[in-house]
Amino acid sequence: MHEHAAGNPLLQPWDTPYGLPPFTAIRPEHFVPAFDVAIAEHRAEIDAIGADPAPPTFANTVAAFDRSGRRLADVGRLFGNLTSSETSPALQAVEMEMAPRLAGHDSWIFMHRGLFARISALFENRARLELDPEPRRVLERIHSDFVRAGARIVGADQARYAVVMERLAELTTQFGQNVLADESSYRLVLRDESELAGLPEFVRAAARQAGIERGIDGCVITLSRSHVVPFLTFSDRRDLRERAYRAWISRGEHEGPHDNRPIAREILALRREQA
């Protein structure tokens, strides 16, 4: 067992039913050490594939690449699900820290000379490999992914490409967190029956619960999709629908700490450079 695994459920076998993550034992502080270990393991696997002295084959190169990084994939999928469904300031801090690091790891893989040389050799000789259609398509897709991710870039341009990708990961993460902050902070309070007109019971129940959670006497519509979409669908009040809709389309588009407009400009500039 890895030295960092003690006390970290993300680095121990998941002996739960169906191999599901042990959600009750997982804390935000477990993720960065788990990512550290998983990235190191993945790099070792990629280095081993790239340095394999045997001639490249589909099995020892493409299939081996596909099998690599399983722990990183498991931790990453779990983290992504939590940040998209039950996030918190602590998880968002981890997300901001890890986004550029994970992007840098991806760039390192796609620009790994040894691995790409083996994939390229197989791709150039694919007509003579007598592969079935499915593995042949996998080979073609992986080769295309590497080329599009900068595998053929050399020298200073390669280093700059990696920097651009890391910055884009940081910016897009901040963009998403700003939108989420606006969604969670917005409150459309409905206090009388006329303001609830047209809303079915399931929408009313969700709005009542949102009010209770926020200590507000009344029903509350937030900008989470589970609130605002049913409200826009069923509400009889055109004026209230308009207020909610305008708030929805203005997320991250206003002065203040959650203003996404300068972030969007930088993202566009970097994507132009990336292209």
Segments the model singles out, each with a brief description of its role:
Residues 1-275:
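Zn2+-dependent metallopeptidase catalytic domains
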